[in-house]
Amino acid sequence: MDGVGESSTQNEVEEKPVIVRVKRKVGQSLLDAFWLEINERPLKRPTLDFSKLSISDSGERGPSVAEDVKPKKVLVRHLETVTDSETTADIIHSFFESDHNEKSCSKGKFEERKIAFKKDNRKEQRLTKSVQKQQIASENARFEQIWRSRKGNKEGIHEKCHFFDVIRVDTEERRDNAQEFTSLEDQKMLASFLPLLRECIPTAAEEIEADIQSSHTEEYVYDYYAVNEEMDISEDSSKNQFPLVIVEDEEEFCDGSDESDYDSEDSNAEDHPKTDYPEEEEEEEEEDDDDDDDDESEEEKSEASDESDDEETSKRHVRSVLGDDEFDDYAEDVYGYSESDEEFES
């Protein structure tokens, strides 16, 4: 029964359609289609129970574990272009209904879309006409995948389809139907005449202001793509016609165990995070502190001895200059005692 459940789950995952949203500048040309290479990562595997392992199991499971997951390559075709990214959920929900009770209805809509693609007898002609355009665009098109957090995703987009979000990062200039923007010097000259134009020709002044503002602002649109199963195109014949976009599958992948290292069973292991053995470090720190204290005490003693030696030297020098009687008076005034006091104390 477990095998049946796993196979049904895998089938549901494989049947999930692929939707790609491309964010691009308005001046960048629209791509009719492109190759999407999905690097699927291995699913997370539960922790092995070593008590249930055997030699036969290791021989059977060895090749499957070592098997690499091959990338999946599909051709996606343009479906719709919008100017607001907030409509993503509405677009996805319009394509795929989430209610299990309306599965038949949503399936019927999907079949209708297939029939519409089949009725398009000019699809091959359109692809042929756009070969040159796509070759030029594919040479300049560069894409980057946008990683977004799936936590708190109330729309449930990833439950309905494999959704990939990418952005065009190429610097392609508008080629088809491109407007001729004036140079910076011409814009400065026109700006100086705007006050006069507002009085004489208000409409021309408005058009010039709009052109100047549009040249400094960058507007974005969002193109939606999906896999068209009815497009019978071989990879060899169209690999140069359409660019390649490489993405990473955002489904659950093997990025380490969900549980942290603090939850491992062998809590007495030396490499366990909770297990800390600070005895050796503490002993080394105490020895360093003792050495520092000894060094400080020795320095204080040496300084005190140096001061006493200097004081005795100065006393002898003063005594030799003043004499014994005058030195006693000097010592009493300076040091607060006389030579007789020292003799009495001794």
Swiss-Prot record:
Top-rank lineage group of the source organism: Eukaryota
Record keywords: Acetylation, RNA-mediated gene silencing
Compositional bias annotation for Acidic residues: 253-268, 278-312, 323-332
Changes seen on gene knockout: Reduced DNA methylation at RdDM target loci and pleiotropic developmental phenotype.
Positions of the UniProt region annotated as Disordered: 253-346
Function in brief: Probable regulatory factor for several RNA polymerases. Effector involved in facilitation of Pol V transcription as RNA scaffold and recruitment of silencing complex to target genomic sites.
Subunit-structure text: Interacts with NRPD1. Associates with Pol II and Pol V complexes.
Modified residues (N-acetylmethionine): M1
InterPro entries for this protein: TF_Iwr1_dom
Family, per entry: Belongs to the IWR1/SLC7A6OS family.
Protein's GO biological process: post-embryonic development; regulation of DNA-templated transcription; regulatory ncRNA-mediated gene silencing
Name recorded for this polypeptide: RNA-directed DNA methylation 4
GO molecular function: DNA-binding transcription factor activity
Pfam families documented for this protein: Iwr1
